[in-house]
Amino acid sequence: GDLHELFRRLVDIESVSMHEAPIADAVEETLAPHRHLEVTRLGNSVVARTHLGRSERVVIAGHLDTVPVVENLPSYIEQRSDGDYLVGRGTCDMKGGIAVALALAVSLENPVRDVTWAFYECEEIAAEHNGLEKIASWRPDLIDGDFAILMEPTDGRVEGGCQGTMRFTLE
């Protein structure tokens, strides 16, 4: 389907943290008919994988949840001097990335690398609820890869990054 239509449909699904079932259902229903993908659901996280025997695997991931809704559902189109904008909860963080990943997952049947598409719950809240962490704990094989891309918004730039802590003692 049309990427803009998919994007708007996803934005119009309320998916506040801990209440992602409707959007996880929509993601699963979008992916399931495509025979080139093995689709697995864990809670309200959905993982789709190709199995083409490629030498490398790329993991492309994004979270399904949003912060609470504040009178911004349903979405609407706002006309500005530089173009039309979809306005609504999650348009930037991160349903735009989810829409792009979903569109690619269903259309990219023969990629040069195997691909894992991970759509996970509960990123916007405390780490103990994080769906990506749960997938890594329950089924690490599902997100094993050689390289990963997180579809978080970056103002249109590719950014390298990592998450971690450093502990030291000053004497």
Whereabouts are the PLM-identified features?
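Acidic active-site catalytic centers that drive phospho-/nucleotidyl reactions
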Residues: 5-6, 65, 93, 123-124, ...
